[in-house]
Amino acid sequence: MREILHIQGGQCGNQIGAKFWEVVCAEHGIDATGRYDGDSDLQLERVNVYYNEASCGRFVPRAVLMDLEPGTMDSVRSGPYGHIFRPDNFVFGQSGAGNNWAKGHYTEGAELIDAVLDVVRKEAENCDCLQGFQVCHSLGGGTGSGMGTLLISKIREEYPDRMMLTFSVFPSPKVSDTVVEPYNATLSVHQLVENADECMVLDNEALYDICFRTLKLTTPSFGDLNHLISATMSGVTCCLRFPGQLNSDLRKLAVNLIPFPRLHFFMVGFAPLTSRGSQQYRALTVPELTQQMWDAKNMMCAADPRHGRYLTASAMFRGKMSTKEVDEQMLNVQNKNSSYFVEWIPNNVKSTVCDIPPTGLKMASTFIGNSTSIQEMFRRVSEQFTAMFRRKAFLHWYTGEGMDEMEFTEAESNMNDLVSEYQQYQDATADDEGEYEDEEEEADLQD
C-alpha cells in the first residue's frame, strides 16, 4: 500500500492536524478508541494509507506530533481523538520557540530534532511502500516554521525520492499574531522552495472571509477555520484512500501541477462550503460544484486568481457522478475563462473522480490551482520583511541564536526571485519563446 506519513508541528500545525484526524477517522468509520465501527468495506480497503493496524485490531494513525512546548500537545491528548495516537509519537520540549524562527531551526528545535527523526524513522519502517510525507505547520511562528523546515530538510536528506507535501499557513495580510511574522515566513519560504515538492498555501484571513461571507458565521473561531482546512486536506488525499474512476497520488498530482520545479505553491479551494453542524440540505449538481470551486472568493489564501493566470490546476470530485459531465464542466470553465489560463500549456486542468463522498455530503470537490497570482502573497510578506530588515528591527533576537544577517539577505532575494519567476510566466505567451531561451541560458550561468 502507498502509505503517507503525517507530521504536525507547532501550535497551529497540531490544531489543524488534530482536526484532520477527526475528519479522516469519520470517513473511515474509526471511532475515538481506534476501533472500526463503519458500515462499508470500502472504508477498510485502503485504510493503511493513513493507519497502522495494531495486533489488537485497533487502527493507529501514522502521525508524528511535535512541538517545543507541552501546551498544545496536552490539549490534543485530552481532545476527542487524543487516545487514538501512539503515545511515543508525541515529541515535545519544554522551552518553547517564542515565535523565533532561529530557536526552532538552530537552537531549541535542533536539540529535539533527533528525537523526532527517530519516531519518523520508526513509522517509515512500518510502511510497506512509503509514498511520502505530509507536514502541517504555520510559517509565522517559531516551531512550525523553524523546526518544521528543519525537519523537512532532514527528511529530504534521508528520503530524497519520497514526496514532500506541506500544508503551510501563511501570515495574514491584516490579522497579525506577532510582529516578526514576515521574518519567520520569509526564512521558511526560502527553505520550502528548495526542499518541499508541493505546498498547499493557506491563510487565516482568507479562511475568515470564507467563514464570514459564505458560511455567514459572525464570529468564526479557529475551530471553524480548521474545519475548512481539514475538509481540503481530506479531499486532496481521498483518491489514495478510496477507489475511484480516475485516481491520483501525490506524485501524479505533482507531475500534473508543477511545470517548473520552484513553482510548487498551490492555492486550494473546496466546495460545497458548509458551516460546521449545518450540512447542506439540497443536493448539489456538478455544474454548481464546479462554479463554486473556481470562485475566487473560495480560495483559501489571500491571493486573487483573477490577478494572474493559472499555469495548471487539478480538481478532485467526490461522490457518485458522471465522469463525462465532470470533463464537460471542466472544459467549459477553461473555454469561458481562457484568458485566465496560460495558452502555452494546453489541457492544463486535470480532474480526478473518487466514488466516496465526505461524511454527510452527497458530492464534494477539492480544487488545487497553480496560479501566478500566488506571488501576491510572497510580495506582501516580502514588503513587510524589507520594511523591518532595512532598519534591522528585531534582528538581535535572531543573531542572538547564532544566525547571520547574510541568511536574511539570501532568504529575501530567493523570495523576490520566486515572485519574478511567477511574473515572467504570467506575461509569457505561446510565441515569444525565442527570448526565453536566451533568458534561461543566462539564468543557468547565474546559478
From Swiss-Prot:
Binding locations of GTP: Q11, E69, S138, G142, T143, G144, N204, N226
Classification via CDD domains: beta_tubulin
Entry binding sites for Mg(2+): E69
GO BP, one annotated term: microtubule cytoskeleton organization
GO MF annotations, alphabetized: GTP binding; GTPase activity; metal ion binding; structural constituent of cytoskeleton
Cellular compartment(s): Cytoplasm, Cytoskeleton
Region of interest (Disordered), ranges: 419-447
Gene coding for it: TUBB2
Tissue distribution of the protein: Expressed in leaf sheaths and suspension cultured cells.
Quaternary structure (record): Dimer of alpha and beta chains. A typical microtubule is a hollow water-filled tube with an outer diameter of 25 nm and an inner diameter of 15 nM. Alpha-beta heterodimers associate head-to-tail to form protofilaments running lengthwise along the microtubule wall with the beta-tubulin subunit facing the microtubule plus end conferring a structural polarity. Microtubules usually have 13 protofilaments but different protofilament numbers can be found in some organisms and specialized cells.
Keyword entries, A-Z: Cytoplasm, Cytoskeleton, GTP-binding, Magnesium, Metal-binding, Microtubule, Nucleotide-binding
Location (main, coarse): cytoplasm
Pfam families: Tubulin, Tubulin_C
Induction: Down-regulated by abscisic acid (ABA).
Cofactor names: Mg(2+)
Name of this protein: Tubulin beta-2 chain
Organism: Oryza sativa subsp. japonica
Function as written in the Swiss-Prot or TrEMBL entry: Tubulin is the major constituent of microtubules, a cylinder consisting of laterally associated linear protofilaments composed of alpha- and beta-tubulin heterodimers. Microtubules grow by the addition of GTP-tubulin dimers to the microtubule end, where a stabilizing cap forms. Below the cap, tubulin dimers are in GDP-bound state, owing to GTPase activity of alpha-tubulin.
